[in-house]
UniProtKB/Swiss-Prot annotation:
GO terms for biological process: maturation of SSU-rRNA; maturation of SSU-rRNA from tricistronic rRNA transcript (SSU-rRNA, 5.8S rRNA, LSU-rRNA); regulation of DNA-templated transcription; ribosomal small subunit biogenesis. Ribosome biogenesis factor. Involved in nucleolar processing of pre-18S ribosomal RNA. Part of the small subunit (SSU) processome, first precursor of the small eukaryotic ribosomal subunit. During the assembly of the SSU processome in the nucleolus, many ribosome biogenesis factors, an RNA chaperone and ribosomal proteins associate with the nascent pre-rRNA and work in concert to generate RNA folding, modifications, rearrangements and cleavage as well as targeted d Involved in SSU pre-rRNA processing at sites A', A0, 1 and 2b. InterPro entries: UTP4, WD40/YVTN_repeat-like_dom_sf, WD40_repeat_dom_sf, WD40_rpt. It holds the Pfam family WD40. Gene3D superfamilies: YVTN repeat-like/Quinoprotein amine dehydrogenase. It comes from the Eukaryota. There is a cross-link at residue 321 (Glycyl lysine isopeptide (Lys-Gly) (interchain with G-Cter in SUMO2)). Its main location: nucleus. Keywords: Chromosome, Isopeptide bond, Nucleus, Phosphoprotein, Repeat, Ribosome biogenesis, rRNA processing, Transcription, Transcription regulation, Ubl conjugation, WD repeat. It comes from Mus musculus. May be phosphorylated during mitosis; may control the association of this protein with WRD43 and UTP15. It is found in: Nucleus, Nucleolus; Chromosome. This is U3 small nucleolar RNA-associated protein 4 homolog. Interacts with HIVEP1 Interacts with NOL11. Part of the small subunit (SSU) processome, composed of more than 70 proteins and the RNA chaperone small nucleolar RNA (snoRNA) U3. May be a component of the proposed t-UTP subcomplex of the ribosomal small subunit (SSU) processome containing at least UTP4, WDR43, HEATR1, UTP15, WDR75.
Amino acid sequence: MGEFKVHRVRFFNYVPSGIRCVAYNNQSNRLAVSRTDGTVEIYNLSANYFQEKFFPGHESRGTEALCWAGGQRLFSAGLNGEILEYDLQALNIKYTLDAFGGPIWSMTASPSGSQLLVGCEDGSVKLFEVTPEKIQFARNFDRQKSRILSLCWHPAGTHVAAGSLDYISVFDVKSGSIIRKMVLDRQHLGVTKSRCIVWGVAFLSDGTVISVDSVGKVQLWDSATGTLVKSHLVANADVQSIAVADQEDSFVVGTAEGTVFHFQLVSMTSNSSEKQWVRTKPFQHHTHDVRAVAHSPTALISGGTDTHLVIRPLMERVEVKNYDAALRKITFPHRRLISCSKRRQLLLFQFAHHLELWRLGSTSATGKNGDTLPLSKNADHLLHLKTKGPENIICSCVSPCGSWIAYSTASRFFLYRLKYERDNISLQRVSKLPSFLRSALHILFSEDSTKLLVASNQGSLHIVHLSEGSFKHLHTFQPQSGTVEAMCLLAVSPDGNWLAASGTSAGVHVYDLHHLKLHCTVPAYNFPVTALAIAPNTNNLVIAHSDQQVFEFSIPEKQYTEWSRSLQKQGFHQLWLQRDTPITHISFHPKRPMHILLHDAYMFCIIDKSLPLPNEKTVLYNPLPPKNESDVFLRRTTHGFKMSKIYKPLLFMDLLDERTLVAVERPLDDIIAQLPPPIKKKKFGT
């Protein structure tokens, strides 16, 4: 792999927001996740659980409910009393609508997807029609005395169950009237609580209503008679979430103790047709409250305060026992939050509402491989740049020369000029920006820092020339097709002649920046692009996809390189394909044109194109060779993929120069330490 001096950075104090809601779309096999800061993420479960889209958060837009309707349309609602629809192409908010019922606690779509119901603070249940352009208010159901905390439609679309404080109501959809009310027992282990909060309800085809509540119970009700059929005490704290499989043969609940319980409908005896709900499996993959759960055909999905999104496969429902059956725990966003100025040894860290600029430390000490060297100069925190307004930062970048910083929110674009005088730094905002620079999904500077490249959410790419005293718009590349496709990833060649852009449809377009025209489009591939970069000298474009495939495309020749064709012909090593985190960054060695450097959250790899490709008989993760190396061992370990798992979780890694790497890690224990304390559970013998 070679010997590098590594700046091991652990002062990026990033803490993801907790998960508040999840919504699974069975038609597209996608999962929507909302976080406590209002951020909404879309995961493509068919594309190796890749986070293919996200919508930035907003301080006044905390999400309490999230659902899919009308096929591929996504809606959310929250305590500001508004319903939002998301534009999944342009990646922005399509519109907002006030429900006029105070804070919204719950929302659900009808089985047909043509109607939405929201439950409000004032006790109202409001029905909306989903039209092609937007939603329209239809009517109110009978108002209740307390807030509506949970809602669920009957699969036939004729009735609705609503959970409140101390009771569950069953509505007739046609009339909007209550036809049944079930009162809950507030007792927990012999102690009567002041309130019983119905956090979640589910309505089954046979008329059974399942409720989860604040006294730790999962209860099954007969909606026709209003009687309690079965009660399961599963926790000493709140049961906060529930989701049912489409086949209605299993459901999952999440508790405030961090436990997820799986219930299944099983036959009482081998010859009996009588079935009963049985708690079969408890899972403890969370440390804090499990605020949201979902049930896909093959997995249980959960998320909560500890920020982890956990996908727990149901082994009996996974046809092929391969890496798809492995537990997934997603913590970090599948996009870069860090940029680097190699020339000045700077790192720019992106947080929700501020940026931090750091200068790396240095050492004059020397040592052997594996030694930790003492710093002769500590890292400097040069700048803390706080945003104005309630919107989260979408993207940011520091220029290679370290003299420019740009960032964007959903409605504003900011550009700053930095000047360095000895140990002091001054910041000057560029105030007169062109009107088209309102918002960006990705920002990039050219290698010489003279060009600013901006991808807007309307599918256009803006090229701007920068100099100390001027700001000139050079060109705008318009979307290639009639539909708006947001460009999420950009890569510029070191010579400044080529720009590669990838959009939400997994296509990659290459633009000629010298002649300001589209040069070519890379052949389409079925999986989203996770990272891309253009190599110096050769101008070969290296593309990583969510299924862990890596391609090399010659921009001058408009075709895949011979090395890439050989790699695809032989295929990747099975252990490489089984990795469950996407490649998020690609770079190149300035003096070794045959080397490609890339990393995901748990692995750093140098691909040496001059060496043989690994096959299934080779050892992919190269251990240190023994002192007495045998020819057999050398043949099994000498290949072009040199991998290291020393640094993890790895949020960013890049070459500063030909002998120096910078690696930014974020240990999970540091994140957990900054979360609120979990509920303490009494253990046996304590």
